[in-house]
Amino acid sequence: MTESYLALESSIDPLTFLTLMTRITQYILPLLFGLLLLSCSKDKQSQQTTQDEQQTPRVATPFEADSAYNFVAKQVAFGPRIPGSSGHTACLAWMKERLTQYGATVVEQSFEATAHDGTKLPLTNLIASYNPSASQRILLMAHWDTRPWADKDPNAANHTEPILGADDGGSGVGVLLEVARLLGSVAPPQTIGVDIVLFDGEDYGSYSNEESWCLGSTHWSKNPHVADYQAMGGILLDMVGGRDASFYWEYFSKSYAPQLLTKVWSKAVELGYGSYFHQADGGGLTDDHVPVIRNLGIPCIDIVNYDPRSEEGFAPYWHTLQDNMSNISAETLGAVGHTVMAVLKELDAH
């Protein structure tokens, strides 16, 4: 999924930027998180060329990429996960069952939202918490709904057909379910808490209205599952399963969570995933991390397959009927999942 949201390209409205900056500066938490990251990081790595990054030897991973792949395939087997559909209902029940089985404290946040076209949408955010009593917390996010229309499909006859959303919707959830499995078994957090939030209603937007996207994250960030919720930082996974995916520094991520962004990308390169994680600027995207930054002041980053060098930015199958399992790579899922687990391990050790 992740979003088909309208890609804002790199042009950001100055007023929007100023509003966001004003809100964010009201919070001191991002500064504290920056100090934490600096204290547990080694010497800064200098930026490497793509060739150097590709030659970095890969480190053995505890993250089971095949398991994450199977989690994606299971979601796709439910069919399109459009709010109110049978596939949506069945997938929600399955995700809740998995997360409960993996030892999380699970909360369902059900609500009704009005879409840009006036449609009343029954939505549910799913929150899974590990070590809920810990005061220092990390937020991991993805969206689990799929786009109702394949409106970027090269065949106009398909524009009203729903997509399967293997990558855009399924991939981020697949990685986080595998993270949850590990947190509930071999890698339980000791000193920090981890909250996995799966957002609904991200992909029901209109390209001409950026506020019409990210309905689930907007609702949760205004009505968090815990009163006065805060986290040291947040990591959003969106479209993280494509073959030969390219993850660049997303604009809002770099603006509001530069320490976390550097931490994650440097760790990815250290682990041998520099061919995926490019240490260079990408575009600005309206994605689920933006409402969380705006409404809660939590510094968040977006790991999203968006290549500013390409014409569309997103993968060719984005919002088309081709967003299916044929475009999902276990290797890409493993690169992202291994990186996230390694960052969690470092933060938990300090």
Each language-model region and where it sits:
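Bacterial signal peptide processing site
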Residues: 41-43
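N-terminal capping segment at the start of a domain
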Residues: 46, 51-91, 102, 311-327
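Catalytic-core environment of secreted peptidases
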Residues: 65-71, 76-78, 102, 124-185, ...
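C-terminal motif of bacterial Sec signal peptides marking the signal peptidase cleavage site
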Residues: 36-39
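Second-shell loop/turn segments in exported
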Residues: 56-62, 77-86, 113-116, 158-170, ...
